[in-house]
Each structure stands twice: as C-alpha cells, then as structure tokens.
Amino acid sequence: MRAPLRFHFARLLLRLILGSLFRVRLEGSERLPRSGAYLLACNHLSWVDPFLLLAWLPASPRIHFLGRRSAIYNRTWKRWVLQFMGGVIPVESGDIEHLSEAVGGALARGGVVAIFPEGKTGRAEGELQELRHGIAHFSARSRAPLVALGLAGTLELWRGKRIDIRVGRTLELHGNVASDMVAVDEAMREALPTYRDPGGARPWSWLTTLLR
C-alpha cells in the first residue's frame, strides 16, 4: 500500500524535528515483514509515540493508527497534521463493527495497522498494563500476522533524551482470544527495551506535556 507524496514529506519533516530533539535508536528493523499487511502492537507512554513510529519505521507498507477521536482530534493543529498525513482510524466508543471494517479495509489494501492495546498511556517505563482484546479479534478476522514493538524513554521527555524502539517477534494468531492474548502479552513484554534513568540535567522538560 503506497503512501501519497505528502506523507513522505511529512514523515521526513517529522524525522528531522524529532531527530533534532531526541537521540532515537531503532533496533530489530530486519524483523519487520517486507511486504504484505500486518498489525503492530506497541506499548504507549507519551503523545510522541505514534510520531516516532511514523518517522522511524519504514514508509511502506503504510502505517495506520487507531486512536480515540477525543485524543487525536483534541487540538486544531494536531487534527490538521493527522489529516494531512492520513492513515488515522478514529475510534468511537461502542462502534465496534465500524472499527472492525476500517481495520480490515486498511489491511486488505496491504497496509499496516498500529495499535496501542493497553488502551491508555502507561505510568512507568518498562511496564505493560493489561491489554484489551480487540487486537486479537482484528488479527483473527483478517488473518494478518502481528508484530510486537517496544518503546522506552518517552514517559518523560527532554532535549537530548535517548529513546529506544525495539521490534520484537512476529506472531501468527489462531482465533482463540484467551491464548492469543497471552502470546501477545508475552511478545510485547519481551520487546520492551531496558530503561535506565540517565539522571543529570533535563533541558526542555516541558516537552513531556507539550501535546497532551
């Protein structure tokens, strides 16, 4: 699934901006499928997480993000950026059928759908909250593989902060929600990078709450 030119432009701009603010390291990119649709399951600590994934993961296949409408469209400029880049699937509470169709459509077109299955931002580095089951249903219905991702370093942000993105295992889920969710939880925990508080000065610490 090819992305429009505007996506490539915005992605390059994002990488330049974020790369000037943080020291981002991507580990295990060779584990990502090179073609075909798949799901990404990642822990979630900060507003910056989806922008990091857009900027550092491959541009093709194109990534689509699930996000609560109230969170992704809560600021005018954020709404403009996300609409400009496209690839956003807004989530409305209780509208499961429409959501399943939107996710299935993106996968059927050969895209990638990234989900933060905790359903909310975490409170501590290196920890994973209880996962919601929707991601197992999406994988089972679409028969798309699922790739586990781990993020570390985004809970608190400051200029020069090191941020790690780690690509974990690829799973083939089988439609048994209980056992599938155990497998997803284990793979996501394995993918979590080790985080050590660097200490020292924290310039521009206001970045932590910039876009909340």
Short names for language-model regions:
Residues 34-94:
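Catalytic core of membrane glycerolipid acyltransferases/transacylases, capturing the structured
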Residues 3-22, 79, 83, 208-209:
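Short hydrophobic helices that act as membrane-entry/anchoring signals
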Residues 17-19, 58, 82, 106, ...:
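A generic structural signal for well-ordered alpha-helical segments
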Residues 13-14, 84-90, 119-121:
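Short, basic, glycine/proline-bearing loop/turn elements
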Residues 2-5, 36, 97-212:
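Non-catalytic C-terminal accessory region of glycerolipid acyltransferases
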Residues 21-25, 93-100:
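Glycine-rich, highly charged phosphate/nucleotide-binding loops
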Residues 14-44:
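Helix-to-loop junction immediately C-terminal to a conserved catalytic motif
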Residues 10, 73-78, 156-158:
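Short, glycine/polar-rich helix-capping loops at beta-to-alpha or helix-loop-helix junctions
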